[in-house]
Each structure stands twice: as structure tokens, then as C-alpha cells.
């Protein structure tokens, strides 16, 4: 196997040269070092027929970088091992590992949870070096850069060996690599974005928010600030020495503290609905809470109107945040090619699901929500192309049924694929509505406590405990799976 790493003068979209390259042939334990004068020799070495090549983040960076500057370069994807992909697969619980490592000083806190090569260097005790921290480190080639490059290969090989000791399957590793290749291709292709229509939507949302804020400004009471006691008279300001003056805060519609004071302290709204609270009992001010207040027939008309305006302002703020105001606003991320090149990590969550950033395309509002259709239609295709949408069905429950198979001979799996699993869960939990069953099962699977589960039926933590007990009684395979996992984990220490 050939373990390699390159150093360039910039990121993928900007780089103009590869300064150096190091390749470790693990079969002979030989390190090859390539400088600007013989870089092509190193690139040709990677193309040796039948040789497996290995590197960290090479699918997303190193290999595309080489291809960009040397178009004749080609590699067999099935012969590529990316230790970033490998590590994400076998060390998905890296945050739990890092709790201890940061506490004892092995890993710097800034690298907590990171899958970077630098972070793994600390975890494995094979440090990368600090050359990259020097000023203009990548402007020109230096011997120190080559040494740093070689150390990256050393860390990569150590990480590969560590990953190889973890239990996984060739099928899983192959699947994750295929997903990474596909996501990189998708990111490079980008999503065609209708910028003109986005600007129109921005204007519509901003004008609507101005209208909402004007209504709020005329309705909200003045919010008390600190009491000011002047030490001397001030005729122009009307101050009298020693006479207290009540000052007031400027109204900030996005301040949850101010909104809570208006609703709870000034209007005495009780927030008695359990769905208005977090699991630890705190009032949560969000769109859902305000929608519940609007529907509360016992609330005064003025309170319901305020709740409606607050809810709409929160919604508009959220939509404008996604569109333009936020750090990753869509309009800020449109490239010169008219596309948004969002990043997808196909194994970013501890559950094995994908994560998205710059921007989070998965959070584009769906058509059933306010302004959802207008947001969705911004993401389009080049002229002459057709856009097709697909969705996966019941992923979590299908995965769950796989692990339940030894305990129920595939009964749950059969219901997932051929029946209506949410209706089955509804009956098992004794819930009146199918949608309640969907909310319940996902909350249950992701660790919701009794209080949270109780909220599903508008009850207490005691109701939640009873609901959980009934569901486990009617679905014994899940209870057996829980016991199996607990017993299995008790035999191991979590860590690298």
C-alpha cells in the first residue's frame, strides 16, 4: 500500500501548484520524498496498476488537487482508502473519547470532536508538527515544508493501523467510501440557485417584517430598565436631584428575555400547556409555543394577537437568516458559476446519518411550511435539465428492525417494509393518533425522557413512564435489544 500526502499553495479552488509530496510504501517500509523538481514522478508512482493508495481526506482534496493540475492523472476509486472516511466510520463516538483526552491534557480543547489529521496525531501520540502555523507557510517550497509533509504521512499510517484494529466490515467501509466519492462529486457540481428570485423573496420578507415590527411597536408595553436617581438638578432634561426616574429599555423583538417579560410578567400569561416547556420545565419561546397561545381561547385577544405577531417575526427572522442575514445565508454562498456548493459529510452524525454545512441544504423549508415553496423553488437546475425529488422511507426504523431481527425473527422488519409500522407502534403504545406514534417512536429512539414522552399525549412524566412501559411490553424485541446492548457495552471501555 502507498500512503501519501501533498502540500499545495492553497485550497482546491485557488491552488496553482503542488509544492511537495511524500509517499510511504508500506510493503518495503520506504519513504519517498518529492520536491517541485520531480513531483510528476510521485504522481506517476500513485498510478502504479493494482496498488492501493491511502491518505487523509484525499477523496475531497488531494486527488482532485492532483487532477486539477495534472489532467492526465487517473486512479481506480476502489483502490483508494481515505483515513478520514475510515476514522469517521470506526470512531463515530470520538466526542466520548475526547471527554477524557481533553480532561487529562492529551488533546487541546480546540480539537475536541475533530477528525482532522492533527487531532488524531494528538490522540495517537504521533504529532503532526507546527510548520503550518508559520506566517505564509504555503507561499513557497521549503525543506521544512517537506519534513512536515513526511510527518503527515507518518500520522496517516498510524491512523490507518489504528482504524484497522477496530471491528467493521469490508462492505461498510466500501459503502462509506462510495458515499464520500458521490458527495464530493455532488458538492463540486453544486446546486443551481435562482439569485434574482432570491433577491425578490428577500425584499418580500424584509417588507413583511417591517410591517410586523411596526405593529408590535404600537402594541407592546414599555419595558422597565434600571431606576436612575440624579445627583443634581438638570432643567433641560427635567431632572430633580434625588427624585427617582424610571428608565425604559428599547424594545428588541428578537430578545426572548423581553418577549417573556411582556407575555408572562406584564400580561400574566400562565404558559400552562406542557408543550410550551422544555423537558426540565423551562418555558421555550419558539414558533410552536406562540401558535399554541394563538389557539388558546382562554387567553385575552390582545395576548393572542401579540403571540401571532411574535410568531410571525420569529419565522421571518429565521427565513431571512437562511436567505441572507445568517453567516451561511444562501445569497452569500452563491459562487460565480451561479451555484451553491454545499458540503455534505455522509457520516457526520453519531447515528451514521449525514450532516450538512455551508449551507445546510437539508434545512431548506419544505413546501408545507410558510414561505417553504418560495424557498424550495430557488434551488433549481440548469436550463434544459429536469429536477427530480426523492425521499427515503423510515430509515431509522428499518435500521432498528435489522438489529431486532435476532429477537423477533424479522416481524418488525416485515412491518416496516410491507405494512404500516407507525400504526403498529400506535397500537403498541396505546396512542389515539398515528402522528403521535411517529413523534413518540423517534423521541423514544433518540433518548427522550419520561417527561418529554408524556408531552406527546399532553400528560406528565408519569404518563410518559406508563407509555414507555406499555410500548416495551407490547414490543418485547426492543426491550431484549436494549438489554443486549447494555450487557455488551458493560464489558468494554470506550476509547482509542
Where do the protein language model's features map onto the residues?
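Conserved "right-hand" nucleotidyltransferase catalytic core of DNA-directed polymerases
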Residues: 1-7, 15, 29, 104-112, ...
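Hydrophobic "anchor" residues on beta-strands that sit immediately upstream
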Residues: 1-3, 52-53, 78, 387
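Short acidic, Gly/Ser-rich segments with clustered Asp/Glu that frequently serve as metal-coordination loops
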Residues: 6-13, 59, 392-399
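Active-site-proximal helix-loop-helix substrate-binding element of RNase H-like nuclease domains
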Residues: 12, 16-19, 23-36, 51-164, ...
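Metal-dependent catalytic core segments for phosphate chemistry
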Residues: 17-20, 396-429
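C-terminal RecA-like lobe
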Residues: 377-381, 387-390, 398-399, 406
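Short, amphipathic alpha-helical "recognition" segments used to contact nucleic acids or chromatin
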Residues: 436-446
Amino acid at each position: 500500500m502507498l500512503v501519501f500526502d501533498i502540500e499545495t499553495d492553497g485550497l482546491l479552488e485557488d491552488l496553482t501548484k503542488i509544492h511537495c509530496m511524500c509517499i510511504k510504501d508500506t510493503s518495503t517500509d520506504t519513504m519517498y520524498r518529492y520536491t517541485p523538481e520531480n513531483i510528476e514522478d510521485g504522481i506517476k508512482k500513485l498510478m502504479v496498476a493494482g496498488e492501493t493508495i491511502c491518505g487523509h481526506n484525499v477523496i475531497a482534496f488531494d486527488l482532485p488537487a492532483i487532477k486539477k493540475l495534472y489532467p492526465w492523472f487517473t486512479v481506480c476509486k476502489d483502490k483508494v482508502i481515505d483515513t478520514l472516511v475510515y476514522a469517521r466510520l470506526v470512531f463515530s463516538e470520538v466526542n466520548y473519547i475526547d471527554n477524557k483526552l481533553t480532561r487529562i491534557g492529551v488533546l487541546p480543547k480546540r480539537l475536541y470532536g475533530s477528525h482532522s489529521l492533527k487531532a488524531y496525531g494528538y490522540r495517537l501520540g504521533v504529532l503532526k508538527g507546527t510548520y503550518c502555523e508559520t506566517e505564509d507557510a504555503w507561499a513557497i517550497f521549503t525543506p521544512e515544508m517537506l519534513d512536515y509533509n513526511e510527518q503527515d504521512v507518518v500520522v496517516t499510517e498510524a491512523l490507518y493501523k489504528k482504524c484497522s484494529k477496530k471491528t467493521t466490515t469490508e462492505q461498510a467501509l466500501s459503502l462509506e467510501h462510495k458515499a464520500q466519492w458521490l458527495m464530493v462529486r455532488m458538492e463540486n457540481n453544486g446546486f443551481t440557485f435562482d439569485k434574482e428570485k432570491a433577491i425578490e423573496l428577500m425584499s418580500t420578507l424584509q417588507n413583511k417584517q417591517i410591517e410586523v415590527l411596526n405593529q408590535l411597536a404600537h402594541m407592546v408595553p414599555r419595558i422597565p430598565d434600571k431606576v436612575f436617581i440624579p445627583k443634581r438638578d438638570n432643567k433641560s432634561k427635567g431632572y430633580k436631584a434625588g427624585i427617582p426616574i424610571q428608565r425604559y429599555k428599547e424594545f428588541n423583538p428578537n430578545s426572548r428575555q423581553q418577549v417573556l417579560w411582556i407575555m408572562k410578567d406584564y400580561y400574566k400569561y400562565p404558559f400552562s400547556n406542557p408543550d410550551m416547556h422544555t423537558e426540565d420545565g423551562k418555558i421555550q419561546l419558539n414558533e410552536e409555543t406562540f401558535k399554541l397561545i394563538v389557539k388558546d381561547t382562554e387567553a385575552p385577544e390582545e395576548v393572542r394577537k401579540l403571540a401571532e405577531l411574535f410568531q410571525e417575526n420569529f419565522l421571518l427572522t429565521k427565513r431571512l437568516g437562511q436567505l441572507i442575514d445568517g453567516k451561511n445565508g444562501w445569497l452569500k454562498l452563491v459562487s460565480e458559476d451561479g451555484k451553491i456548493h454545499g458540503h455534505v459529510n455522509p457520516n457526520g452524525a453519531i447515528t451514521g446519518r449525514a450532516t450538512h454545512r455551508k449551507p445546510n441544504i437539508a434545512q431548506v423549508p419544505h413546501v408545507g411550511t410558510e414561505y417553504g415553496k418560495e424557498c424550495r423553488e430557488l434551488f433549481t437546475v440548469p436550463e434544459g435539465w429536469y429536477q427530480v425529488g426523492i425521499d427515503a422511507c423510515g430509515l431509522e426504523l428499518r435500521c432498528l428492525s435489522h438489529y431486532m431481527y435476532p429477537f423477533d425473527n424479522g416481524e418488525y422488519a416485515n412491518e416496516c417494509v410491507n405494512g404500516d409500522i407507525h400504526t403498529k407502534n400506535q397500537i403498541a403504545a396505546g396512542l389515539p393518533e398515528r402522528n403521535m406514534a411517529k413523534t413518540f417512536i423517534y423521541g423514544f429512539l433518540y433518548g427522550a425522557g419520561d417527561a418529554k414522552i408524556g408531552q406527546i399525549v399532553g400528560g406528565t412524566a408519569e404518563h410518559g413512564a406508563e407509555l414507555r412501559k406499555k410500548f416495551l411490553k407490547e414490543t418485547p424485541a426492543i426491550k431484549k435489544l436494549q438489554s443486549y446492548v447494555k450487557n455488551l457495552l458493560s464489558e468494554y471501555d470506550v476509547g482509542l
